[in-house]
C-alpha cells in the first residue's frame, strides 16, 4: 500500500553474499545486473557477457536467486524502491545480536533486512521517522549453523 505514497521510502534488501566485488552474491539490483530473460520474465538478471545465467550465491536459501521479478525491477528503475545489500557475515552477526538482545530467532533472510535497516537508521539520525520492517519466518532451522559460526569466530 505504501508504493503510492510520496513521503514514504521503500527499501529492498538483497544478499551481497561474500561481497558484491567478489562476484559471489545474489544482489541483482544492487550490483546493477543487466536486463535479461529468466523463467520467461524480462527483468534484471545475474548473467555473463554471453547472456548465460550466473549462479547466485548466499547463505540464505530464500534469497538465492539470479533474478528479480519484473514489477520490482520496474519500481526500482523509477526510483520508487531503493535497494541495499547485506553480506552473509553481516546477516549472521545480526542473527546473533537479535537472539542475544531480543530473544527472537529471526529467519536468516530477515537478518539481511534488519541489518540494512539499522544501518540506514543510523545514517539518517532522524528521531521523528518511523521505520517498519516486514519480517516473516523462523530461525529455528538456522540455530545450529549460527552456533557453529559463533564458535568458529570467537
Ranges and model annotations:
Residues 2-3, 57, 74, 112, ...:
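Sequence-level detector for tyrosine residue identity
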Amino acid at each position: 500500500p505504501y508504493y503510492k505514497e510520496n513521503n514514504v521510502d521503500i527499501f529492498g534488501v538483497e544478499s551481497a553474499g561474500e561481497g558484491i566485488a567478489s562476484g559471489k552474491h545474489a544482489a541483482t539490483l544492487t550490483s546493477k545486473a543487466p536486463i535479461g530473460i529468466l523463467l520467461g520474465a524480462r527483468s534484471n538478471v545475474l548473467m555473463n557477457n554471453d547472456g548465460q545465467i550466473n549462479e547466485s550465491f548466499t547463505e540464505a536459501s530464500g534469497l538465492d536467486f539470479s533474478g528479480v521479478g519484473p514489477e520490482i525491477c520496474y519500481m526500482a528503475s523509477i526510483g520508487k524502491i531503493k535497494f541495499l545489500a547485506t553480506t552473509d557475515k553481516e546477516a549472521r552477526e545480526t542473527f546473533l545480536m537479535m537472539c542475544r538482545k531480543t530473544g527472537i530467532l529471526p529467519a536468516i533472510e530477515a537478518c539481511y533486512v534488519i541489518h540494512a535497516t539499522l544501518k540506514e537508521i543510523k545514517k539518517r539520525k532522524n528521531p521523528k521517522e518511523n521505520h517498519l520492517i516486514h519480517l516473516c519466518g523462523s530461525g529455528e532451522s538456522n540455530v545450529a549453523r549460527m552456533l557453529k559460526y559463533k564458535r568458529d569466530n570467537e
